[in-house]
A protein has these predicted regions:
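N-terminal maturation segment of proteins
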Residues: 1-299
């Protein structure tokens, strides 16, 4: 935790600055959030348009992810809507990950057709990576097919930093795959999002410097979210304390490991991490046979 505290404020500032610089390069006359919303983060007009785009983005993500990780030939990721009773439970849908113990290679992504106006082209591009290819679905499949103890194939909270860190890493690793020059802007905005999550976790729960109401305002002012969305995000902080650290902290830990293994090719590195099982991200050091002390071990 001391390691995260050291960098959390600087990370948020640098993420915001990078997002603003990228938006300014596209259109220096407008607010960065407005640039985002007018280019890559435009709402869909119909559910059908949303579903068709998601299928297309999944195909693109699969083709390009295979450059970074070995994928089973028979992998299938279907796109479906949510059931009516799920529409309020999953406002943005969910990833239907396969059962690793059954060695399944079929997975799915459910999009909330009742809330289609909340989706944009850029958000679906990001979901196709984060939830599927170089993200959660392929992670669960790789774990299921790996030659590791069965106990390592049982999902658990201890594996969350590795799982979310890998999926978040994929967003930046594959940000150029769609041939859309504005998608990296959404990826930069997403980085602000995960950095703000860390900032709120630390200042709301560790230091007690901000209230939930303050956190809602931060999500609205920094991210451009409406009040309802911001309140939902803060509610997630309150219901699952600590989880929102997993995305960015996990990603940064993975990159620290990567920096120690520059002679290792990317595909071998990715295959190793995706097939390690649902283990503590600290134990990844043993899997990769890294002898040096990591930054979080020095605090």
């Amino acid at each position: 935790m001391k390691w995260i505290v050291k960098w959390h404020e600087k990370e948020l500032r640098s993420s915001i600055d990078r997002f603003k610089e990228m938006a300014c390069a596209i259109d220096p006359t407008r607010d960065p959030i407005e640039v985002l919303k007018s280019t890559i983060h435009v709402s869909y007009s119909t559910p059908e348009e949303m579903f068709n785009d998601m299928k297309k983005f999944l195909e693109i993500a699969r083709d390009h992810a295979s450059k970074y990780i070995d994928l089973p030939q028979d992998i299938v990721c279907e796109v479906t809507g949510v059931r009516e009773f799920e529409k309020d439970i999953y406002p943005m849908g969910y990833a239907g990950v396969p059962d690793p113990l059954e060695k399944e290679t079929k997975c799915m992504i459910a999009l909330n057709q009742y809330n289609y106006r909340a989706f944009s082209r850029g958000w679906l591009m990001m979901m196709a990576i984060h939830e599927a290819y170089y993200g959660h679905n392929i992670h669960w499949i790789k774990v299921g097919l790996a030659d590791i103890p069965e106990s390592f194939k049982i999902p658990s909270d201890i594996g969350s930093p590795l799982a979310e860190g890998l999926a978040h890493r994929g967003e930046e690793l594959l940000q150029d795959i769609y041939g859309d020059k504005s998608f990296p802007l959404l990826v930069a905005w997403r980085r602000v999002h995960t950095a703000l999550r860390v900032y709120i976790e630390i200042n709301m729960f560790l230091y007690n410097k901000i209230t939930p109401e303050d956190a809602v305002k931060l999500y609205m002012n920094i991210m451009g979210f409406d009040e309802q969305t911001a309140k939902g995000l803060v509610e997630a902080h309150l219901e699952n304390r600590g989880y929102n650290l997993c995305y960015l902290a996990g990603y940064k830990m993975i990159e620290e490991y990567r920096s120690k293994l520059r002679d290792l090719d990317e595909k071998t590195f990715s295959n190793t991490l995706f097939s390690a099982g649902f283990i503590s991200i600290r134990n990844v050091k043993k899997v990769l046979d890294i002898k040096e002390d990591m930054p979080w071990e020095k605090d």
